[in-house]
């Protein structure tokens, strides 16, 4: 029997990424794990609906044996079985992030016995999670360069607190994974500001993109009033397309925060990214660790080595025979993986 990997959910930044990475890697490698202190670093520790849905989705996709899969649980034992391609549908039952559930199971389905379609219902545009736009426009084009055939479609927008959104991904097994090197982003080719509005006055989006335009005069502007009762909700993004990759920075409207303040938050993140020669933004760096580890080679530059990034690296190295280096440079960090 494979050895059980013991993980401390309180290590590093103590968030849900430790659990999601462990589930992905356990399915792929066949190694069981047990985790204590799940999300110990959060205000509400233990499994929330989003995390529980990820656990149950992983369980269904590989026929795992699992203990501790209940709301609020801070202990989990997961023993995987073989990964099975097919049609899957999961509902979070709240505005929890569809994208984080998808990012838990999709890496395993790169190694399935056939093609798959996974549909998840919940939130598609959430605080502290990659949006559907980020997955489609930023992450998946980079995965394609690594030899991964995966396409996500946004079915319906869903915002906190109502949820009600949905996204689906079609994924094919990968014959092999290629490494990816992102040292320089190259010249900026195009910048696009987009405000999404669901049951929110149109002038809010107009003010948001106007504020972004003051920071980025060259940006194209787009205000989208969503139909179909998917609100209330408001998401503002700035997409920066460069020669080597696309980045996307987002913020969300909340009651009591002005449209201008939301836009200035996006502008601050984007300006900080552009002020550094690093190719990859802080959040994208987190999303690249697992696919690069599975490829066994690759490198990228990032302005800041966050606790989230370092924690994810530590979890990956428990499951895979790879080693990451994180070397300080004059303008940030060079992150490399080798087997």
UniProtKB/Swiss-Prot annotation:
<feature type="binding site">
    <location>
        <position position="103"/>
    </location>
    <ligand>
        <name>ATP</name>
    </ligand>
</feature>
<dbReference type="Pfam" id="PF01137">
    <property type="entry name" value="RTC"/>
</dbReference>
<comment type="function">
    <text>Catalyzes the conversion of 3'-phosphate to a 2',3'-cyclic phosphodiester at the end of RNA. The mechanism of action of the enzyme occurs in 3 steps: (A) adenylation of the enzyme by ATP; (B) transfer of adenylate to an RNA-N3'P to produce RNA-N3'PP5'A; (C) and attack of the adjacent 2'-hydroxyl on the 3'-phosphorus in the diester linkage to produce the cyclic end product. The biological role of this enzyme is unknown but it is likely to function in some aspects of cellular RNA processing.</text>
</comment>
<dbReference type="InterPro" id="IPR036553">
    <property type="entry name" value="RPTC_insert"/>
</dbReference>
<dbReference type="InterPro" id="IPR023797">
    <property type="entry name" value="RNA3'_phos_cyclase_dom"/>
</dbReference>
<keyword id="KW-0067">ATP-binding</keyword>
<dbReference type="InterPro" id="IPR000228">
    <property type="entry name" value="RNA3'_term_phos_cyc"/>
</dbReference>
<dbReference type="GO" id="GO:0005524">
    <property type="term" value="F:ATP binding"/>
</dbReference>
<dbReference type="InterPro" id="IPR013791">
    <property type="entry name" value="RNA3'-term_phos_cycl_insert"/>
</dbReference>
<keyword id="KW-0547">Nucleotide-binding</keyword>
<dbReference type="InterPro" id="IPR017770">
    <property type="entry name" value="RNA3'_term_phos_cyc_type_1"/>
</dbReference>
<dbReference type="InterPro" id="IPR013792">
    <property type="entry name" value="RNA3'P_cycl/enolpyr_Trfase_a/b"/>
</dbReference>
<dbReference type="GO" id="GO:0006396">
    <property type="term" value="P:RNA processing"/>
</dbReference>
<keyword id="KW-0436">Ligase</keyword>
<comment type="similarity">
    <text>Belongs to the RNA 3'-terminal cyclase family. Type 1 subfamily.</text>
</comment>
<dbReference type="GO" id="GO:0005737">
    <property type="term" value="C:cytoplasm"/>
</dbReference>
<dbReference type="GO" id="GO:0003963">
    <property type="term" value="F:RNA-3'-phosphate cyclase activity"/>
</dbReference>
<protein>
    <recommendedName>
        <fullName>RNA 3'-terminal phosphate cyclase</fullName>
        <ecNumber>6.5.1.4</ecNumber>
    </recommendedName>
</protein>
<dbReference type="Pfam" id="PF05189">
    <property type="entry name" value="RTC_insert"/>
</dbReference>
<feature type="binding site">
    <location>
        <begin position="283"/>
        <end position="287"/>
    </location>
    <ligand>
        <name>ATP</name>
    </ligand>
</feature>
<feature type="active site" description="Tele-AMP-histidine intermediate">
    <location>
        <position position="308"/>
    </location>
</feature>
<dbReference type="InterPro" id="IPR037136">
    <property type="entry name" value="RNA3'_phos_cyclase_dom_sf"/>
</dbReference>
<keyword id="KW-0963">Cytoplasm</keyword>
């Amino acid at each position: 029997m494979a050895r059980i990997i013991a993980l401390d959910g309180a290590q590093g930044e103590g968030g849900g990424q430790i659990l999601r990475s462990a589930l992905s890697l356990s399915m792929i490698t066949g190694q069981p794990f047990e985790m204590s202190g799940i999300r110990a670093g959060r205000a509400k520790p233990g499994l929330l609906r989003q995390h529980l849905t990820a656990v149950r989705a992983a369980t269904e996709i590989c026929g795992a044996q699992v203990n501790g899969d209940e709301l609020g649980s801070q202990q989990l034992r997961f023993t995987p079985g073989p990964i099975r391609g097919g049609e899957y549908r999961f509902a979070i039952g709240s505005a929890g992030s569809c994208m984080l559930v998808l990012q838990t199971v999709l890496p395993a389905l790169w190694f399935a016995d056939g093609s798959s379609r996974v549909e998840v219902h919940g939130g598609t545009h959430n605080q502290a999670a990659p949006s559907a736009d980020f997955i489609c426009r930023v992450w998946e084009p980079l995965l394609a360069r690594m030899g991964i055939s995966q396409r996500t479609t946004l079915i319906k927008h869903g915002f906190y607190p109502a949820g009600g959104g949905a996204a689906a991904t079609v994924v094919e097994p990968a014959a092999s994974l290629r490494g990816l090197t992102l040292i320089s982003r190259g010249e900026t080719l195009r910048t696009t500001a987009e405000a999404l509005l669901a049951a929110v006055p149109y002038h809010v989006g107009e003010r948001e993109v106007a504020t972004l335009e003051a920071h980025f005069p060259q940006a194209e502007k787009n205000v989208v009033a969503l139909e179909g009762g998917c609100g209330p909700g408001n998401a503002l993004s700035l997409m920066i397309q460069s020669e080597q990759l696309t980045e996307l920075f987002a913020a969300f409207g909340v009651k009591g925060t002005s449209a201008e303040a939301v836009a200035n938050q996006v502008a601050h993140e984007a300006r900080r990214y552009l002020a550094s020669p690093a190719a990859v933004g802080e959040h994208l760096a987190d999303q690249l660790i697992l696919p690069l580890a599975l490829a066994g080679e690759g490198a990228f530059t990032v302005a800041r080595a966050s606790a989230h990034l370092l924690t994810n690296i530590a979890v990956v190295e428990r499951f895979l025979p790879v080693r990451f280096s994180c070397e300080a440079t004059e303008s940030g960090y060079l992150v490399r993986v080798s087997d």
